[in-house]
Amino acid sequence: MKFVVWPSEIDSRLPRKYGRLVKKEVALEAPTPEEIRDAAEILGMKVIEFEPEKLNPRLSGIDEELRTKGMLRIESPYPKGKSLRMICEKIRELRAKKRKAHGKRKKR
């Protein structure tokens, strides 16, 4: 299945009115297009198109700080909803690993 993914679809700071598609408990704070791309590729999904500067038209009416730029066209064997939940879970794992690695470096 091919579909478009906007970072706003998995951003916990946004209400569903502005395009969040996953539950707030599953969503992430301020996901970046690069994080989404990396997570999708690790999960075996194919990123067909990647436009980090594109803005979701739904976000034109909200505060600048909540506007998350980026658009990805992804091909996945799973439906969009399941793919988004998997991507959120993988980004959460990657962020935890990054924090853990960063924390280890500080201890000397």
Curated annotation (Swiss-Prot):
Pfam families: SRP19. Keywords: Cytoplasm, Ribonucleoprotein, RNA-binding, Signal recognition particle. One of its GO terms (biological process) is SRP-dependent cotranslational protein targeting to membrane. One of its GO terms (molecular function) is 7S RNA binding. InterPro entries: Signal_recog_particle_SRP19, SRP19-like_sf, SRP19_arc-type. It is found in: Cytoplasm. GO terms for cellular component: signal recognition particle. Belongs to the SRP19 family. Part of the signal recognition particle protein translocation system, which is composed of SRP and FtsY. Archaeal SRP consists of a 7S RNA molecule of 300 nucleotides and two protein subunits: SRP54 and SRP19. HAMAP family: SRP19. Involved in targeting and insertion of nascent membrane proteins into the cytoplasmic membrane. Binds directly to 7S RNA and mediates binding of the 54 kDa subunit of the SRP. This is Signal recognition particle 19 kDa protein. It comes from Thermococcus kodakarensis (strain ATCC BAA-918 / JCM 12380 / KOD1). The lineage of its organism: Archaea, Methanobacteriati, Methanobacteriota, Thermococci, Thermococcales.
